[in-house]
């Protein structure tokens, strides 16, 4: 009985770790949103609507503003 209980617990632990590996890891992804400009909170609103993330306007080297969206994703 003790061996079968130990074997059962061991199998459950192995299966649990396999499921965790299959599901993937959470990470922070980022994407430039060209569909919007950076005026009046539109970057933040679009990022929140599309990816449930946080949008922020950043300035490029040629002094243009681009919307950068950071969101949680699975890799």
Curated annotation (Swiss-Prot):
Cystine crosslinks: 29-73, 38-57, 43-67, 47-69
Keywords associated with the record? Antimicrobial, Disulfide bond, Fungicide, Plant defense, Secreted, Signal
Compartments, record wording: Secreted
Task: Please give the biological process terms from Gene Ontology that the record holds.
Answer: defense response to fungus; killing of cells of another organism
- Signal sequence span is 1-24
Which InterPro entries does this chain map to? Answer: DEFL
Q: Name one GO cellular component term.
A: extracellular region
Kindly name one Pfam family recorded for this protein: SLR1-BP
Q: Which family does it belong to?
A: Belongs to the DEFL family.
Protein name, as recorded: Defensin-like protein 127
Q: Which gene encodes it?
A: LCR20
């Amino acid at each position: 009985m003790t061996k079968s209980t130990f074997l059962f617990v061991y199998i459950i632990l192995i299966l649990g770790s396999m499921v965790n590996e299959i599901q993937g890891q959470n990470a922070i992804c980022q994407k430039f949103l060209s569909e919007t400009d950076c005026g009046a909170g539109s970057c933040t609103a679009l990022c929140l609507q599309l990816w449930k993330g946080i949008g922020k306007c950043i300035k490029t080297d040629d002094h243009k503003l681009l919307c950068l969206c950071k969101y949680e994703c699975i890799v």
